[in-house]
């Protein structure tokens, strides 16, 4: 499996209407692009650990999209719903980091040893 990880920070002045439009486009993309296998979203939670100070600049939100393979991710990236989401994303966010990862299978330790 391939994970597409997006860390992002919304504009501090984003309007409620713009935020709703962004979320609607996000929902449309994840429900209409057939290669998306799983999606998780999160909001940063601070617990006072020392490592938190090392993560600057911090990102408030993340989105994690899962695909069967690289071809599935590439199909997602090229899909019209993702292209539309991407254009809207840049008008709603001030910064982002995006990474793609190969996920370990059921025997994660064995997979990690092979890396």
Located regions from the model:
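Core segments of cupin and vicinal oxygen chelate
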Residues: 19-21
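Non-catalytic surface loops within mature trypsin-like serine protease
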Residues: 10-12, 43, 67-69, 105
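Short, flexible turn/loop "capping" segments at secondary-structure junctions
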Residues: 1-2, 55-57
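Active-site-flanking beta-strand signature of metal-NTP-handling nucleotidyl enzymes
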Residues: 2-10, 62
